Amino acid sequence: EGAITNKNSINMDDVESINVLKGPAATALYGSRGGAGAIIITTKAGQSEKGLLEVSHTLQAETYYNHFNMQKLYGGGGYGGTEKGNRAQDIYDLYSGDIPGLQGAYVYDYNEDTSWGAAYDPAVKYVTPLSLDETSGHYGKPATWQHGLDLRDLYRTGVTNTTNVSFSKSVKDFNTRVSFTNSYRTGVQPNSDAIRRFLGFKTNFKPTPWMNVSLDYKYTYRQDHNAAESGYNGSRTVLQEYTQWGQTNVNLKDYKDYKRPDGSWRTWNINSVNNQSAAFHDNPYALFHEYNHRTIYQWNVFSGDVSVDLPYNLKA
């Protein structure tokens, strides 16, 4: 309706029409601010003489789509030795500890966070970090040296519920519309959600036969809890951690039980057999559930317009 506003403050349930202006048309209305064009959104107004109450609800589901074509030939390690035992990064070093069940299994470079180590071999059993953790259900159990990383294990199905309630009424020389929308979304990333609330009021009336008054008010509330991050931004960008880094032999589902009885976190990227603290990467499920970051934004948008019909069909 002519008021410049943030796109995040727009409630699509209130939109009646959208028009795109380019070039001189946008510049004529908005000056330099319209130099790149303008999107004109007209919101709904009251239309029913008797009064109309409308209620709508939408349910939307979303899921993570994995389109990464990741190599499945080599496991954790940095140099991919071609002969058994010729590099420290190879898996082919026998476990020398005293944990029952692990004798005859191999260890590898747990500290390394890339997957160019020894080639996979289903005949080989290896010691995982969980095999060394006496508080884990995997304690004393070796795993098969094979590809196990599935990024879909990091995510869930996200669901969005949106409810809109509006009331509109129109009589001679007067129309009004009030609407409220509440939207709650659980994200595909565990322990993430978002809230959107929109309140809108729009009225038009003619106090005299030659004057028209239009008033519009919009309130928007937006809260994000653990919104997804992007780029090289530390351990919170979990997807980046397992596409740029990571070990493809790790089965992430084994690490969903991420917390030990003492409160410390289990991770696949330990420093060594004797040091189970994280070398570079924490447990992704711990990052999802133990960090809670909330951001709240609010917008109040007021706009008003008065037009006066003068004699000789002139307007001001």
Question: Residue locations for each model-derived region?
Answer:
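A short glycine-leucine-enriched loop at secondary-structure breakpoints
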Residues: 29-33
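Transmembrane beta-barrel strand/turn architecture of Gram-negative outer membrane proteins
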Residues: 14-17, 34-67, 76, 83, ...
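Residues embedded in well-ordered regular secondary structure
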Residues: 1, 47-191, 229-231, 259-276, ...
